[in-house]
Curated annotation (Swiss-Prot):
Belongs to the class-II aminoacyl-tRNA synthetase family. InterPro entries: aa-tRNA-synt_IIb, aa-tRNA-synth_II, aa-tRNA-synth_II/BPL/LPL, Anticodon-bd, Anticodon-bd_dom_sf, TGS, Thr-tRNA-ligase_IIa, Thr/Ala-tRNA-synth_IIc_edit. This is Threonine--tRNA ligase. PANTHER family: THREONINE--TRNA LIGASE, CHLOROPLASTIC_MITOCHONDRIAL 2, THREONINE-TRNA LIGASE. Residues 8-74 form the TGS domain. Homodimer. Residues 273-579 are annotated as: Catalytic. GO terms for molecular function: ATP binding; metal ion binding; threonine-tRNA ligase activity; tRNA binding. It is an enzyme of class 6 (ligase). Zn(2+) binds at C378, H429, H556. The keyword Transmembrane does not apply. It comes from Corynebacterium efficiens (strain DSM 44549 / YS-314 / AJ 12310 / JCM 11189 / NBRC 100395).
Length: 694
């Protein structure tokens, strides 16, 4: 091959394959250019596809019509894993149709940490079925089937080929109307209508095909490690009025080691599942009589929640926020004005028809009107701002509420406390001038990080969502200036910043605070959202120093997301063992024998006098049984007392890790516990940590 048509590195200073840029001459496949440059095709960093200058992923078989620059996408990158997982979903579907003839295909996208595929099948899948399917998948992968892209000549040609696949036919008919961010876009997004054929490398015969946009890995041998994780019921396109399907979930990684790490994390996550811990620790429940996604907090859970809210309330008052309260329901006119009925009606509960009047004969004399349970608090906060004239001297005005909202989440996505239908937001709306914006955003972000650290989270990064040029309101210049300010504030925080291009809502850019928990999972915690839309819709104004009327800038800020969700996150983060300041039961006295109960009751009385949650276990259980019970109950301080303790006016500490400190004088024990709780120490006390305080 001549030098003119050879591939070239564009960036030769890189040290990881994830950042390698290379030039591909016209008429040459990306994979061929990659081989010329000796980029890896095996191992964790094997190149599985490439990204063009517009951010579009391309198969390695793609041949550019003109010389073009691409970025190599290795298996161990997020994009690389997503492509491997989507290809593994195809292998899953091929295996299911081989093992269960007559199965109809839904969709099979890559998702976070894995993939799924939906099937219309006669009977629900069993655990044994998953083993059989997994075995068939391994055989398919071993053959090294090639993924080959094929463009349909027409919609009619695609429909003819897929005549026996009703769900695929529906997608074909909907092409052009599919939300580009939906799972369905995996199959029929923008551009040509295409299929991917799984081709036997020995016979060159097509073994199986699927409607798909791609891209895909070159062959099934690029799937080194996968596992099917579970199956569940699902609805076609997530709509409960549509056909019921069976969904199989799986995960795939660039190496067996990474798969093992993930499965270990999953096992640990299962132990920490807040739904299970909520039952075991008697914290909350979801009674069928009340309905899906509507939690009930029991006394233990209510104590934790109260402590969470009270600490947050104190911090907000110190930071200059004004507390407000708003009702749970409102006339539909308010949400018409705010735009929520136009944009979010599907996510709202159905309206309540109220205020109609009737005469004695039952004839309606006055029509009723629609009321809605509120999905958001911001429209009501705007009414508070607009309830009287505002001066620039009042700004920034920070309104805060623990406001309960209701959102009609589909039953398939409701998940314990972390995805509920009724929940309470720690919701703030800040009204400020443009000159105050940067200082206020800096203050808000610092406050968020500081408060989250108070609860024991300490590993954060930020995500900046910027304007979608096809979907926004407001002036371009304001968007650009505000985005620059957000970026500067985020950068100055010292936290890692991840871009989310075109990810902003239509009304303004935002920063999201992402936090990692004790086992390395990432949770989106807080959002700081600018809004150029609602101040216009509500015609909000303040009087400026020159007497003119000006629009304030509005900042939406939910720190926890919701109390319920944050409760679930903390419950899993601490595996149920809440820090002593949050724990529903902080101290329990355990007598060696019944005779020592009065001694422990005196100790408990001293602790209660200081406002701590303490009690003596006076049950008939033996001491060792009591220790096991309260260890399982995650009580941070267990105080034991026997004859020597009574004689010395002392107690012995027992901790959740099994360590013990004996013979601590009662007054000293009370001070140690008091210091530990009042300082809001987020670690569990132990022999070592208590010794350090003495």
């Amino acid at each position: 091959m001549s030098a003119r048509r050879s591939a070239n590195f564009v960036n030769t200073s890189v040290t990881t394959h994830e950042l390698v840029e290379f030039e591909v001459p016209a008429g040459i496949a990306i994979g061929q250019a990659m081989r010329e440059l000796n980029l890896p095709n095996k191992g964790d960093d094997a190149i599985v596809c490439a990204k063009d200058t517009e951010g579009q992923l391309k198969d390695l078989s793609h041949v550019p019509e003109e010389t073009a620059t691409f970025t190599a996408v290795p298996a161990n990158s997020e994009d690389g894993r997503a492509v491997i997982r989507h290809s593994c979903a195809h292998v899953l579907a091929q295996a299911v149709q081989a093992e269960f003839p007559g199965t109809k295909l839904g969709i099979g996208p890559a998702i976070e940490n894995g993939f799924y595929y939906d099937f219309d099948v006669a009977e629900p899948f069993t655990p044994e079925d998953l083993k059989t399917i997994e075995k068939r998948m391994k055989k398919i992968i071993k053959t090294g089937q090639k993924f080959e892209r094929r463009v349909y000549e027409s919609t009619e040609a695609a429909a003819a080929e897929l005549a026996d696949e009703p769900y695929k036919l529906e997608l074909i008919q909907d092409k052009g109307n599919v939300d580009p961010d939906s799972d369905e876009a995996t199959e029929v997004g923008a551009g040509e209508l295409t299929a991917y054929d799984n081709v036997n490398p020995r016979t060159n015969e097509v073994e199986w095909s699927d409607l798909c946009r791609g891209p895909h890995i070159p062959t099934t041998r690029y799937i080194p490690a996968f596992a099917l994780t579970r199956s569940s019921a699902a609805y076609w396109r997530g709509d409960q009025t549509n056909a019921g399907l069976q969904r199989i979930y799986g995960t795939a990684w660039e190496s067996k080691e990474k798969l093992d790490e993930y499965q270990t994390m999953l096992a640990e996550a299962e132990k920490r599942d807040h739904r299970r811990l909520g039952t075991e620790l008697d914290l909350f429940s979801f009674p069928d009589e009340i309905g899906s996604g509507l939690p009930v907090f029991h006394p233990n859970g209510a104590i934790v929640r109260l402590e969470m809210e009270e600490h947050s309330r104190r911090r907000h008052i110190q930071a200059g926020y004004s507390f407000v309260n708003t009702p749970h329901a409102t006339k539909s006119d308010l949400f018409e004005k705010s735009g929520h009925l136009g944009f979010y009606k599907e996510g709202m509960f159905p309206p309540l028809q109220l205020d109609a009047e009737y005469d004695a004969e039952g004839n309606q004399t006055k029509p009723g009107q629609d009321y809605y349970l509120k999905p958001m608090n911001c429209p009501m906060h705007n009414l508070i701002f607009d309830s009287r004239g505002r001066s620039y001297r009042e700004l920034p005005l920070r309104l805060f509420e623990f406001g309960t909202v209701y959102r009609y989440e589909k039953s398939g996505v409701v998940h314990g406390l972390t995805r509920a239908r009724g929940f309470t937001q720690d919701d703030a709306h800040i009204y400020c001038t443009e000159d105050q914006l940067e200082e206020e955003l800096t203050s808000v972000l610092e406050f968020i990080i500081s408060l989250l650290k108070d609860y024991g989270l300490d590993d954060f990064y930020l995500e900046l969502s910027t304007k979608d040029p096809k979907k926004f309101v407001g002036d371009d210049e304001i968007w650009e200036r505000s985005t620059e300010i957000l970026q500067r504030v985020a950068t100055n925080s010292g936290l890692d910043l991840v871009p989310d291009p075109e990810g902003a809502a239509f009304y303004g850019p935002k920063i999201s605070v992402q936090a990692k928990d004790a086992i390395g999972r990432t949770w989106q915690m807080s959002t700081v959202q600018l809004d150029f839309n609602l101040p216009e819709r509500f015609e909000l104004e303040y009087t400026s120093p020159d007497g003119s009327k000006q629009r304030p800038i509005m900042i939406h800020r939910a720190l926890f997301g919701s109390i319920e969700r944050f409760f679930g996150v903390l419950l899993e983060h601490y595996a149920g063992a809440f820090p002593a300041w949050l724990a529903p039961h902080q101290v329990v006295g355990i007598p060696v024998a019944e005779d020592f109960i009065p001694h422990l009751e005196k100790v408990v009385d001293k602790l209660r006098a200081r406002g701590f949650r303490a009690e003596v276990d006076t049950s008939d259980d033996r001491m060792q049984k009591k220790i096991r019970t309260h260890t399982t109950g995650k009580i941070p301080f267990m105080l034991l007392a026997g004859g020597r303790d009574v004689e010395a006016d002392a107690v012995s500490f027992r901790f959740l890790d099994g360590t013990q400190v004996n013979g601590v004088p009662v007054d000293e024990a009370v001070e140690l516990i008091s210091t530990w709780i009042l300082e809001r120490n987020n670690t569990q006390p132990s022999e070592e940590t208590i010794a350090a305080l003495r």
